[in-house]
Structures are given as structure tokens and as C-alpha cells.
Amino acid sequence: MSAPFEERSGVVPCGTPWGQWYQTLEEVFIEVQVPPGTRAQDIQCGLQSRHVALSVGGREILKGKLFDSTIADEGTWTLEDRKMVRIVLTKTKRDAANCWTSLLESEYAADPWVQDQMQRKLTLERFQKENPGFDFSGAEISGNYTKGGPDFSNLEK
């Protein structure tokens, strides 16, 4: 299985006025639609452990305190096809129990259905990581999957 889990199974995006955001166990992805023809020099992006700010052509698009902490040194942004800015943030808490319910503390919350789908996806990703010989990319999950699902780590092998 060479492709990452999210490439095989898809992502659960949360739509916003400027684009969308989604998450994996380890990262949060922010995709911002910008005017076609935007150049990298038109973009100002500030990434800190708990804050993000993005302006394009002097117009503020996104600014605020993140839902949870990230590793500031590992955050990156790219301009893709001169029409989309992709920001990738690395979570400090990288487990299925750490499902972000919103991008910022007070904005861009996922609705309850999307939150549920995000939690299911992170739990399946956790199972994939714990059982690399199996392919969970097309699996469905029900039952106890909130907060990362059941903990089997202390069962006898």
C-alpha cells in the first residue's frame, strides 16, 4: 500500500466561504481559493503553533486562533495552479481521539454530520496504522468510534 490512507479512502472536507479544510491523524489541510493568476508574492501567510493568518493582495482571508496546537516549524503553504493556496499544519496531538471540530476556536466549525464523518475517518486511519497488513480504505465503521474508538492496546497478544 504505497499511497497514503487519505488518497485511497478520500477526505471529509468542511466547506467554508473561502474554500475548505480537512484533517488526517497527523495533519490539518486548509485549501483557500484565490483569484486566478495570483502570484506567490501577493500572498502573506503567517503560521504559528496556535495561530494562522492569510492575506492575498492585501485582503485578509483567514486569521485567528487554531482549534488546537500545531508544530509551527512544520507548517507549510503552497500556491497551486495560481488559483489555490494549500496550507498544511502538523498536529501536536496525532491520534484519532484528537479530531478537530473546527479550524479556528470560534470559526469554521464542521456541522454535526461532517464531525461524525471526520471522526469515523480518523478512527479507520488509526486502525490502518495499527494493522498495516489490512486495507481499511473502503471500510465502514459503526458503534464505538468517537474519541478514536476502542483501545485494544492493553489486550494480551
UniProtKB/Swiss-Prot annotation:
The lineage of its organism: Eukaryota, Metazoa, Chordata, Craniata, Vertebrata. The keyword Acetylation applies. May regulate the LIS1/dynein pathway by stabilizing LIS1 with Hsp90 chaperone. InterPro entries: CS_dom, HSP20-like_chaperone, NudC_fam, p23_NUDCD2. It comes from Homo sapiens (Human). This is NudC domain-containing protein 2. The gene is NUDCD2. It holds the Pfam family CS. CDD domains: p23_NUDCD2_like. Residues 134-157 are annotated as: Disordered. PROSITE patterns: CS (PS51203). Keywords: Acetylation, Centromere, Chromosome, Cytoplasm, Cytoskeleton, Kinetochore, Phosphoprotein.
